[in-house]
Amino acid sequence: FCSAGIMLPNGASGCPLHNLIPEWNDMVYRGQWQEAYERLSLTNPFPEFTGRVCPAPCEGSCTVGLIGEPVTISSIEYEIIEHAFQNGWVKPAKAPATGKRVAVVGSGPAGLATAHYLTSVGHAVTVFERSDRPGGLLMYGIPNMKLDKDIIQRRLDILEEAGVTFICNTEIGKDIAAQDSDDTYDTDVLCGGATHARGINVEGNDAKGVHMAMEFMTANTQNIL
């Protein structure tokens, strides 16, 4: 795989984000940690999340695995972003103001990524979240043993420093009329998550003690925070 040459068939299909994995792997090998972080950031705004919770399909696609154990790509990604934080390379994404105002509905992974990229080109971004704190699935759907809440807050602080405004306990269409949002902002970006469980059509699925995972995780996390 070489991003500057001819792509081999399925050469980058192992990563849904199309991370430039061979490139930053090589940079880490050469001790070029800051360059590796900059390369990783081209395709992934939040490596500290994916480095901890991504199921790493890239490792399943790693050709080294044909002759032995695959490269531990997820661990390398984790080390790159933590090196970046420790050395002060992770900075708020700022740009000259465009005068455009954007409302982002939902503060899960999609909403946060949208806020990051829009702020990085100079738009004023307000993120609306119906829960009591931002983060969505990251905050309420993933336990601390996989993704500590301090890691999420660290990124939220950076986004706020970049100029992103978070408004929680607010549901568009209920607490604020959708028309009011349209009148106040130049555009709206809908980033709502899939919060309603589908359930399973089996006998006993409604028995006492059977809980949908997201409902259980959300309630459990709210009790802890």
Language model features by range: what are they?
Residues 1-101, 149, 190-220, 225:
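Ferredoxin-type iron-sulfur electron-transfer modules and their immediate structural context
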Residues 77-225:
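Residues forming the flavin
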